[in-house]
């Protein structure tokens, strides 16, 4: 597999085999050192409590802000995953064990999990489910729970891009479903 880097001498784009420690430019003979690969961050998913969008975030995050509806979702680990067949299209759905219902991403039908449930299976990598807090509009009589306190250290914002499965629009064309979110990690 090949990678690319910009020559530090003449600014040309150089191609080189992945894993090479340095690259010699054929034009200016400058040797450009290849930086070490970026550390791989473990990622997890949760469904936004405000708009039901699938969000991806780094595993060490305490909260995840949805870029679609600005809901701050609290992250809590879930150790078991259960399965249920969609009540409409019969697709097998995965959900955190103990959830009262699950919405099918294909047909949008909401299935109660108390029926047709397969026993939970231990998750090989813990996934996360989020609870959320939305600030009510000013002047509203909505009684929301108080927000949780923020971490004491300065969090670092990380932009996260999630590419969901493609769908077909009314004209029969494939549509990409990409969501961009911001997560606050430690």
From Swiss-Prot:
Gene name linked to the record: LOL3
Record carries keyword GTP-binding: no
Record lineage: Eukaryota, Viridiplantae, Streptophyta, Embryophyta, Tracheophyta
Region (Putative zinc finger 2): 45-75
Function: Putative zinc finger that may be involved in programmed cell death and defense response.
Gene Ontology CC: one annotated term: nucleus
Membrane-spanning residues: none
Protein's cellular compartments: Nucleus
Record region (Disordered): 120-157
Region of interest (Putative zinc finger 3), residue spans: 83-113
NCBIfam families, per the entry: LSD1
Keyword Nucleus found: yes
Highest taxon, organism lineage: Eukaryota
Comp. bias intervals (Polar residues): 133-143
UniProt protein name: Protein LOL3
Region (Putative zinc finger 1): 4-34
Native source organism of the sequence: Oryza sativa subsp. japonica (Rice)
Entries under InterPro entries matching the protein: LSD1-like (IPR040319), Znf_LSD1 (IPR005735)
Record's signal peptide: none
Keywords from the UniProt entry: Nucleus
Pfam families: zf-LSD1
């Amino acid at each position: 597999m090949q990678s690319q880097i910009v020559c530090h001498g003449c600014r040309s784009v150089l191609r080189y085999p992945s894993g090479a420690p340095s690259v010699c430019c054929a034009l200016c003979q400058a040797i450009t050192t290849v930086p070490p690969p970026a550390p791989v961050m473990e990622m997890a998913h949760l469904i936004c409590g405000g708009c039901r969008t699938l969000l991806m975030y780094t595993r060490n995050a305490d909260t995840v802000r949805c870029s679609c509806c600005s809901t701050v979702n609290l992250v809590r680990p879930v150790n078991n995953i259960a399965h249920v067949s969609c009540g409409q299209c019969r697709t097998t759905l995965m959900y955190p064990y103990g959830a009262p219902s699950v919405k099918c991403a294909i047909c949008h039908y909401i299935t109660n999990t108390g029926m047709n449930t397969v026993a939970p299976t231990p998750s090989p990598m813990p996934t996360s489910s989020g609870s959320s807090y939305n600030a009510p509009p000013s002047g509203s009589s909505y009684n929301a729970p108080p927000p949780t306190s923020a971490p004491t250290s300065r969090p670092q914002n990380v932009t996260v891009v999630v590419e969901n499965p493609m769908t077909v629009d009314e004209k029969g064309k494939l549509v990409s479903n990409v969501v961009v979110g911001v997560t606050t990690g430690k």
